Amino acid sequence: FLQTKPGLVGNFTYGKYTKSSLNFGGYNMEFYTKAVDNKVVASYGETLGTALDFYTKKFGDSNSGKKIIVAQIDDESLDFYSTQGMIFMATRLLEQPREITEERLQREAAYQWWGLTVGLKSFDDVWLSQGLAEYSAVTLRESTTDAAKLEDLRRSEGVIVDEVGARTRLARQSTTPGGAPVPLKIGDTLELND
């Protein structure tokens, strides 16, 4: 392996895999899986390819180039892990496809830019890459959602758009003692509690 630009330490996985190659939006994606339904691989490939294409158009090329590898790992590890040009996914995510997994895959794709292409000065800056990756994924979902569903998406994502178009991600909207959401207005100051 040769890496000519500074970056985080890479990783590898070893096992008996089935290789599935997909092309989407100019990206060559290789999925290395163990006994996973081809429809799931195709669906995740489309999700990943759409995300990579969107981020490339929005932010320019990432250091990982036009090839990305997705490798299945065991459930005893993390759900996802991203390194330059590679995304690791836990087995359960490939065996039980859900919408939330596709949303997280969009975020993992964004790490090819935030934290890997745009590096971190120190470990204390990790929150920046996490926030920018989440922002990128929400922006992608907003761009592919019709107006009727956009408000629901913003509420479920906890995103409020102010009058100048700046986006602020909230952990969760506050609720009244009865459980009803507290109405928020542009310019409100929010206190987020753990």
For the regions a protein language model found, what residue spans apply to each?
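Structured beta-strand-rich cores of soluble
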Residues: F1-G26
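Sequence-level motif detector for i,i+2 pairs with an aromatic at +2
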Residues: V9, F24-Y27, G65-K66, T83-Q84
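Hydrophobic alpha-helical and helix-loop surface patches within well-folded domains
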Residues: F1, Y32-D194
